[in-house]
């Protein structure tokens, strides 16, 4: 979703390569000819869907790729992007549906390109990944079984990354990374983007509760590497037909590892629950199914469970506040930036109105029902 560490600032420049320039990059950096190219939505980077032309030199390799051009701030952290890219490769080798990484002509996983705009020279990190099949789960009604599978996938991903090693792994300790759930108190400097209203009051209350209850509990949470952005546009699915004629969905792709950082298991499940609620007609029920799937791999401790409600509320606040702030910087990208806001404020308010105890009861009872083989 987002990528700059520290404060988001107007110094961050979102890339603005034309399709012709992007095609030229694919050829000059990766040695591949482009037959077709089209832009893909992105928060503050730039992505293109690229079809590769077959030539005598490139008879094998992928037919479709995604060209990823990082913004100027992210491009200043090549170690971090290198680690994230190697994680994608590691997970693919472990059987996860992540992209393959196309190497540059110099056999690297990324390349730094400089662009002279006349007044200054700006540098952008570029990568090329294989294009994954499927459609975002945002496009389908998600039933309990798929929610369970997504929760399970999130836990398996974090658990698998316990075995990941890289000499630059420490770059995932991203101090003050605005999208890490630990950074919720940093939202205060962006609250002006909301104006003065009920939404802002709720966010202010959540931030205060986070400081009082979560910050004091962090030492009791189990650490791990988080994907950090398992939203309904970053998980792809393909469908097939069951013996009874029903649609059966299978996860075919996990996208966008740009928000990876060290966090906690409970952060990952909270983030996943929040994003699975966005398009749901029964959002409060979602959490129990995702939690059941997650806990089938990584059972939460009582302290972690006790923080879950507030962590889900906190992720809503992060997404909603930073979207409002980013809209002021990039009004032309408003439709993409405000995806969460369409239902997010309503869901956050509903959670707040119901209160922690009532929501937890629904989540934990639903999760418990899976233990006895009855899903609610």
Swiss-Prot record:
Function of the molecule: Catalyzes the GTP-dependent phosphorylation of 5-hydroxy-L-lysine.
Catalytic reaction equation(s): (5R)-5-hydroxy-L-lysine + GTP = (5R)-5-phosphooxy-L-lysine + GDP + H(+)
Give the superkingdom in one word.
Eukaryota
Main localization (coarse): cytoplasm
Q: Which GO terms describe its cellular component?
A: cytoplasm
Q: What is the active site of this protein?
A: 229
Give the location in the cell.
Cytoplasm
List the PANTHER family hit by this protein, alphabetically.
Answer: AMINOGLYCOSIDE PHOSPHOTRANSFERASE DOMAIN-CONTAINING PROTEIN-RELATED, HYDROXYLYSINE KINASE
An example molecular function term from Gene Ontology annotations:
amino acid kinase activity
| Annotated protein name in UniProt | Hydroxylysine kinase
**Keyword Ligase set for record:** no
Q: What is its EC number?
A: 2.7.1.81
Which chain positions lie within coiled-coil regions?
A: none
Please state which protein family the record places this protein in: Belongs to the aminoglycoside phosphotransferase family.
| Gene that specifies this protein | HYKK
What residue intervals traverse the membrane? none
Q: What keywords appear on the UniProt entry?
A: Cytoplasm, Kinase, Transferase
Pfam entry (one)? APH
């Amino acid at each position: 979703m987002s990528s700059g560490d520290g404060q988001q600032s107007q110094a961050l420049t979102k890339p603005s390569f034309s399709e012709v320039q992007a095609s030229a990059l694919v050829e000059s950096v990766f040695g591949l000819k482009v037959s077709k190219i089209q832009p893909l939505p992105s928060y503050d980077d730039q992505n293109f869907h690229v079809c590769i032309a077959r030539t005598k030199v490139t008879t094998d390799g992928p037919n479709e790729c995604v060209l990823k051009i990082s913004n100027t701030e992210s491009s200043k952290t090549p170690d971090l992007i290198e680690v994230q890219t190697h994680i994608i490769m590691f997970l693919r080798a472990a059987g996860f549906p992540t992209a393959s990484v196309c190497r540059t002509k110099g056999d690297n996983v990324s390349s730094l390109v400089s662009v002279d705009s006349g007044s200054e020279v700006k540098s952008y990190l570029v990568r090329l990944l294989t294009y994954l099949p499927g459609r975002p789960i945002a496009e389908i009604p998600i039933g309990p079984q798929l929610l369970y599978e997504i929760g399970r996938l999130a836990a398996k991903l974090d658990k698998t990354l316990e075995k990941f090693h890289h000499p630059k792994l420490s770059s995932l300790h991203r101090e003050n990374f605005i999208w890490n759930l630990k950074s919720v108190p940093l939202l205060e400097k962006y609250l002006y983007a909301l104006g003065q209203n009920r939404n802002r009051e709720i966010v202010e209350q959540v931030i205060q509760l986070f400081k009082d209850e979560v910050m004091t509990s962090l030492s009791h949470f189990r650490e791990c590497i988080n994907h950090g952005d398992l939203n309904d546009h970053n998980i792809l699915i393909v469908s097939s037909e069951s013996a009874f004629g029903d649609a059966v969905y299978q996860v075919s792709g996990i996208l966008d590892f740009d928000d990876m950082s060290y966090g906690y298991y409970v952060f990952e499940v909270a983030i996943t629950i929040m994003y699975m609620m966005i398009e749901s007609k029964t959002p409060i029920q979602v959490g129990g199914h995702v939690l059941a799937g997650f806990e089938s791999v990584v059972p939460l401790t009582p302290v972690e469970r006790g923080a879950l409600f507030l962590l889900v509320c906190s992720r809503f606040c992060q997404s909603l506040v930073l979207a409002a702030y980013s809209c002021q910087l990039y009004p032309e990208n408003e439709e993409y930036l405000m995806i969460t806001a369409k239902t997010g404020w309503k869901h956050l308010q509903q959670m707040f109105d119901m209160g922690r105890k009532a929501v937890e009861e629904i989540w934990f009872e639903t999760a418990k029902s899976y233990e006895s083989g009855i899903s609610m």
